[in-house]
Amino acid sequence: MQGRLSAWLVKRGLIHRSLGFDYQGIETLQIKPKDWHSIAVILYVYGYNYLRSQCAYDVAPGGLLASVYHLTRIEYGGDQPEEVCIKVFASRRNPRIPSVFWVWKSVDFQERESYDMLGISYDNHPRLKRILMPESWIGWPLRKDYIAPNFYEIQDAH
């Protein structure tokens, strides 16, 4: 079943894949990494002016990594804001996705957290560096194939 946004994208020749609807009726779309930045700009111009959240997850051990964006179309005088969920999958070997920082500034720390925990590199992000783990940390703690070190160095807080 195709939703309103998916039909609108098809009508304009924008490549995507509909993944259906969640339990709240929010449409979920899959966008290829190479198409993501241009489609993000188009969605912003179309009215999706609020990025509610961005997160990432490891699909399966040895499999793909996913970056997920929850967008909201807020219109003045509208009763119910329209929402959409966008999933962008990246290969585990070289997980690179265009950053949408220059479209929605609120994604700044969220993309940094996804980089820090899963190793997804967001191209053209102005400050892509670890945010939770120390810069010296090796590996990506939320990947399903991550092997936790058997020691932890206690650092002085001073």
UniProtKB/Swiss-Prot annotation:
Matches recorded under InterPro entries: NADH_DH_suC, NADH_quin_OxRdtase_su_C/D-like, NADH_UbQ_OxRdtase_30kDa_su, NADH_UbQ_OxRdtase_CS
Enzyme class, spelled out: translocase
Gene assigned in the entry: ndhJ
Catalysis: reaction(s): a plastoquinone + NADH + (n+1) H(+)(in) = a plastoquinol + NAD(+) + n H(+)(out); a plastoquinone + NADPH + (n+1) H(+)(in) = a plastoquinol + NADP(+) + n H(+)(out)
UniProt similarity note: Belongs to the complex I 30 kDa subunit family.
Pfam families documented for this protein: Complex1_30kDa (PF00329)
Organism (species): Jasminum nudiflorum
EC number: 7.1.1.-
Gene Ontology process terms (BP): photosynthesis, light reaction
Protein name: NAD(P)H-quinone oxidoreductase subunit J, chloroplastic
Keywords: Chloroplast, Membrane, NAD, NADP, Plastid, Plastoquinone, Quinone, Thylakoid, Translocase, Transport
Subcellular location: Plastid, Chloroplast thylakoid membrane
Assembly: NDH is composed of at least 16 different subunits, 5 of which are encoded in the nucleus.
